[in-house]
Amino acid sequence: SGSKTAEIDDGCFGLPLDPIGSTSGMGCRSVPKPIPGGS
């Protein structure tokens, strides 16, 4: 989330209100993988 790679199509919430999701990957609903470039 917030990152370029963090998008709804990627299984993550591409919303700026979820900055933690882009760094820890907790923004992903099915695949909790770390999103590069999130920090």
Swiss-Prot record:
- Tell me which GO cellular component terms the UniProt record holds: extracellular region
Tissue-level expression reads: Expressed by the venom gland.
Q: Which Pfam families does this entry report, sorted A to Z?
A: ANP (PF00212)
Its name, as the record gives it, is Natriuretic peptide PaNP-d
Q: Which residues form the propeptide?
A: 1-8
Cellular compartments annotated: Secreted
Q: What does this protein do?
A: Snake venom natriuretic peptide that targets both NPR1 and NPR2. Exhibits hypotensive and vasodepressor activities.
Keyword Cell membrane set for record:
no
InterPro entries reported for this sequence:
Natr_peptide (IPR000663)
GO MF annotation: an example? hormone activity
Recorded source organism is Pseudechis australis
Family per similarity comment: Belongs to the natriuretic peptide family.
What is the taxonomic lineage of the source species? Eukaryota, Metazoa, Chordata, Craniata, Vertebrata
List the keywords (alphabetical). Disulfide bond, Hypotensive agent, Secreted, Toxin, Vasoactive, Vasodilator
The UniProt entry's GO biological process terms, in alphabetical order, are: regulation of blood pressure; vasodilation
Which Cys-Cys disulphide bridges does the record give? C12-C28
Chain intervals for the UniProt region annotation (Disordered): 1-39
